[in-house]
């Protein structure tokens, strides 16, 4: 599907997709500089877990209530999405509102809503029984790399992170941030600390087989949970003194539930992910705090659990409030911290040019003409969405 991409004032830089991307930020970020140096630097680790990962939002709400400032965030999969939004300057309550109001079925759908189709397109929609997109190479049909290409999800993430889109060094976000993905060809963990924030979040969330891989800097990236679902070592490398680790986990099914090949395959994957997480947890110290939301056997693919997951995240964090409060700051310091965090989101970016990606001479001129009057203007997302 052709995508008209509007690139804003500062061109996106290439990401340094190596373990070196997890190195400590060279300077304190703007938000925590206002708090002074006489406090430990706090790192937040958010695990992967699909829909279960929305429990992270409840934890963030409690951290905000307790006035616990975060100096660095490392996240995997849904932890990278929630962590990326928080690092962009959103509060826990704001992320709760965003996620709770999001139409997840629509976000995971590549096709536009039927109500937006022309009459001819609606007829075509009825005529073709197979909705799966097919490719053609060398006279042979090709199946897609994932059931979901993820274009609408990427659009949603880009819209939310647009105010910080010009920031290509994740250390310069309101809170320094790292997202973890897996190189599909090598199986290596890929730590993303620069480049396009939306692409980093989207790559970390790309469950193989479900979402198409994201190509970034010449590498095919999928869900970071395969290589490092609980990126404790990544956060530690960001120069923090104390870690707050939120692990939503992957439940293992009992023998009676292991009834089909896909379920058995998922069980094997869950075992591998849990084992890697246990190795990471073994590196924690007595000063670190671990929060395990009581999610039971809730499915990673059921986004109908979002409200309950957020509530259970809050419950688990409140259960650790005595320890968390030890790292709280007073109200004046917290207000300064919030002001610095939100500053990056105040001014909308400016549109410098319009580029069609992937390029197509057939579509280029009419699409560029549809947007040319917006060049040089502050980006109005409503106007852009209506023209797309």
Where are these regions (language model features)?
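Bacterial N-terminal signal peptides
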Residues: 1-10
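Patatin-like phospholipase
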Residues: 12-76, 84-388
């Amino acid at each position: 599907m052709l995508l008209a991409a509007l690139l804003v004032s500062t061109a996106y830089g290439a990401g340094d997709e190596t373990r070196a991307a997890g190195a400590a930020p060279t300077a304190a970020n703007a938000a925590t500089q206002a708090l002074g140096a006489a406090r430990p630097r706090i790192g937040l680790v958010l695990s992967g877990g699909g829909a279960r990962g929305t429990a992270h939002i409840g934890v963030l709400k409690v951290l905000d209530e307790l006035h616990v400032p975060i100096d660095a965030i490392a996240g995997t999969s849904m932890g990278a999405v929630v962590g990326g939004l928080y690092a962009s300057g959103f509060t826990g309550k704001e992320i709760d509102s965003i996620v709770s109001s999001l139409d997840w079925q629509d976000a995971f759908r590549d096709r536009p809503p039927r109500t937006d189709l022309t009459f001819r397109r609606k007829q075509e929609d009825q005529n073709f029984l197979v909705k799966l997109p097919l490719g053609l190479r060398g006279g042979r049909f090709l199946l897609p790399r994932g059931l979901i290409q993820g274009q609408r999800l990427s659009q949603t993430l880009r819209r939310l992170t647009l105010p910080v889109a010009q920031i290509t060094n994740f250390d310069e976000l309101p809170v320094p941030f790292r997202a973890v993905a897996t190189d599909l060809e090598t199986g290596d963990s890929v730590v993303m600390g620069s480049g396009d924030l939306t692409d980093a979040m989207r790559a970390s969330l790309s469950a193989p087989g479900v979402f198409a891989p994201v190509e970034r800097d010449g590498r095919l990236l999928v869900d970071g949970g395969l290589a490092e679902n609980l990126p404790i070592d990544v956060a530690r490398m960001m120069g923090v003194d104390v870690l707050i680790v939120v692990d939503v986990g992957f439940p293992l099914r009992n023998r009676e539930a292991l009834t089909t090949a896909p379920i058995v395959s998922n069980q094997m994957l869950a075992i591998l992910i849990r084992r890697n997480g246990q190795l990471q947890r073994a590196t924690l110290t007595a000063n670190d705090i671990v929060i395990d939301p009581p999610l039971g056997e809730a499915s990673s693919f059921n986004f109908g659990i979002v409200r309950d997951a957020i509530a259970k995240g809050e419950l688990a964090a409140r259960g650790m409030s005595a320890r968390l409060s030890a790292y709280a700051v007073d109200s004046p310091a917290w207000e300064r911290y919030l002001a610095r965090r939100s500053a990056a989101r105040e001014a909308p970016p400016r549109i410098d040019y319009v580029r069609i990606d992937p390029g197509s001479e057939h579509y280029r001129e009419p699409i560029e003409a549809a947007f040319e009057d917006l060049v040089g203007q502050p980006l109005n997302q409503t106007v852009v969405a209506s023209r797309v």
